[in-house]
Swiss-Prot record:
SUPFAM superfamilies: Ribulose-phoshate binding barrel
Name of this protein: Orotidine 5'-phosphate decarboxylase
Keywords: Decarboxylase, Lyase, Pyrimidine biosynthesis
Enzyme kind, highest EC tier: lyase
EC id: 4.1.1.23
Length: 286
C-alpha cells in the first residue's frame, strides 16, 4: 500500500515533506532567463530542487494553486513536475484540497489519480461530508493511492469552524477525526497506518497531541513548521516511535538560497542543506 511506501521512506530519509509551492518569483532571475516560458522556468527549477533533495526528503507536496495561477503553462509545469517525481520513484502529494460530492468528486479523483495529473496522495476538504470522500476509495483499494483529509489545520481561521461545538459537546475537528479514523480502517497497511491520513498543523500542540493519542494509526501531514511558528520539538510530539507523520516545508527550503551570499547560483545546494538541517533538527528530538 502507498502508506507503507511512505512509512518506509520516512524510516530511510526522515520526516521532511518538501513543498513545491513554486511561484515564478522564487526562481532566481539569472536561472529564469535561461528559459523562454514560465512553464520551462518553473519545471526546471523544480527539477533542480528534486535532484538535489531526493535522498534527504521523504516525499514532495505540490500545491496546485501555484501552477493554476499561471494558466495552461503553469498546469503544464505541474504535470511535468508530477511526471518527473514518478520517474524518480518519489512520493507525490497533490495538494488540491478538493471537497465536492458525487459525480464531481469522481471526476476529481480521476483527474488526480490518473492521467496527466497523477499523484500518490491528494488532500481533501471534508466539509461536505463522507460522500465527498467515498469516490476516492476505489483508487485507494485498487491503485494504491492515499488521502490526507483536513482535520486540525495550522491557520488562525481554524477556530472559525473547526472548534464549533457539536450537539454531543465535541469540537467539529473531533467529529471529523472519528469519521476519518473509521473510514481509514479499511485501508490499513503492514506498517499499521492507514492510507487515509489527516492534515494536522503543529501550531496548536495540545490539540495535536490529543489527536495523536486518540488516533494511533492515522498518518499525519503536518504543516505549520518554521514560518508559522511550529518547532522540531513540537513536531516530535505528533509522531509515534519516530514515524507516523511527515512535516511540510515550502519556502523555508525553496528560498533558502536568499540567506546566502551569491545563493542564486547554488539555489539547489542551499535547498538540500536546508532540508538536511530540518531533517536533523527533527531527528534530534526523537
Amino acid at each position: 500500500m502507498i502508506i507503507d511506501r511512505l512509512f518506509d521512506s520516512v524510516e530511510k530519509k526522515g520526516h521532511v515533506c518538501l513543498g513545491l509551492d513554486t511561484d515564478i518569483t522564487y526562481v532566481p532571475e539569472e536561472f529564469c532567463k535561461k528559459f523562454n516560458s514560465i512553464e520551462d522556468a518553473i519545471f526546471n527549477f523544480n527539477k533542480k530542487i528534486i535532484d538535489a533533495t531526493l535522498d534527504v526528503v521523504s516525499c514532495y507536496k505540490v500545491q496546485i494553486a501555484y501552477y493554476e495561477a499561471y494558466g495552461l503553462k503553469g498546469l503544464l509545469a505541474y504535470k511535468r513536475t508530477l511526471e518527473y517525481l514518478r520517474e524518480k520513484k518519489a512520493i507525490a502529494i497533490a495538494d488540491i484540497k478538493r471537497g465536492d460530492i458525487a459525480k464531481t468528486a469522481e471526476m476529481y479523483a480521476k483527474a488526480h489519480f490518473e492521467g496527466d495529473f497523477e499523484a500518490d496522495f491528494v488532500t481533501l476538504n471534508p466539509y461536505m461530508g463522507l460522500d465527498g470522500i467515498e469516490p476516492y476509495m476505489p483508487y485507494i483499494e485498487k491503485m494504491e493511492k492515499g488521502l490526507f483529509i483536513l482535520l486540525r489545520t495550522s491557520n488562525k481561521g481554524a477556530y472559525d469552524i473547526q472548534y464549533i461545538k457539536t450537539q454531543g459537546g465535541k469540537n467539529v475537528y473531533d467529529e471529523v477525526g472519528e469519521k476519518i479514523y473509521d473510514l481509514g480502517q479499511k485501508a490499513t497497511g503492514r506498517s499499521k497506518y492507514s492510507s487515509i491520513g489527516a492534515v494536522v498543523g503543529c501550531t496548536h500542540v495540545e490539540e495535536g497531541v490529543e489527536i495523536r493519542n486518540k488516533f494511533k494509526n492515522m498518518f499525519f501531514l503536518i504543516p505549520g513548521y518554521g514560518a508559522q511558528g511550529g518547532t522540531a520539538k513540537e513536531v516530535s510530539l505528533y509522531l509515534r516511535e519516530g514515524n507516523g507523520g511527515v512535516v511540510n516545508s515550502s519556502r523555508g527550503i525553496l528560498l533558502a538560497y536568499k540567506k546566502e551570499e551569491n545563493g542564486e547560483k547554488i539555489f539547489d545546494e542551499c535547498a538540500r542543506l536546508a532540508a538536511i538541517n530540518m531533517r536533523d533538527e527533527i531527528r534530534k528530538t526523537l
